[in-house]
Amino acid sequence: MRHGHGLRKLNRTSSHRLAMLKNMMNSLIEHEAIKTTVPKAKELRRVIEPMITLAKVDTVANRRLAFDRLRDRDSVTKLFNELGPRFAKRPGGYTRILKMGFRVGDNAPMAFVELVERAEEGAAEAKAAE
């Protein structure tokens, strides 16, 4: 039986998939909004939401767990100093996935992944990038 095994393989090896998700987590923490395909966005949501929940309680052990998963000191610092306190009263649902049409080259469905309570400077950056 195949119960409870609902992860997407995304046509990648396991090491490539893990590295890609780490990079996407770091980008989302740094920029607070990224553009990607819909399946990647849905997988990213599955891994970033527990990281933000972990950052709500700022302990050395939690920082070490976060660093083990992110491998970037700047991302861990921002996660615990800015994002954890920002989402302290929100019981989950930290990300929003907005569908935004199809990619020109291969017609892949694209999505905009952003943190729900974005900082104002992050919102201004995203509008400038569009």
Curated annotation (Swiss-Prot):
<comment type="similarity">
    <text>Belongs to the bacterial ribosomal protein bL17 family.</text>
</comment>
<dbReference type="InterPro" id="IPR047859">
    <property type="entry name" value="Ribosomal_bL17_CS"/>
</dbReference>
<protein>
    <recommendedName>
        <fullName>Large ribosomal subunit protein bL17</fullName>
    </recommendedName>
</protein>
<dbReference type="GO" id="GO:0003735">
    <property type="term" value="F:structural constituent of ribosome"/>
</dbReference>
<dbReference type="InterPro" id="IPR000456">
    <property type="entry name" value="Ribosomal_bL17"/>
</dbReference>
<dbReference type="GO" id="GO:0022625">
    <property type="term" value="C:cytosolic large ribosomal subunit"/>
</dbReference>
<keyword id="KW-0687">Ribonucleoprotein</keyword>
<comment type="subunit">
    <text>Part of the 50S ribosomal subunit. Contacts protein L32.</text>
</comment>
<dbReference type="Pfam" id="PF01196">
    <property type="entry name" value="Ribosomal_L17"/>
</dbReference>
<dbReference type="InterPro" id="IPR036373">
    <property type="entry name" value="Ribosomal_bL17_sf"/>
</dbReference>
<dbReference type="GO" id="GO:0006412">
    <property type="term" value="P:translation"/>
</dbReference>
<keyword id="KW-0689">Ribosomal protein</keyword>
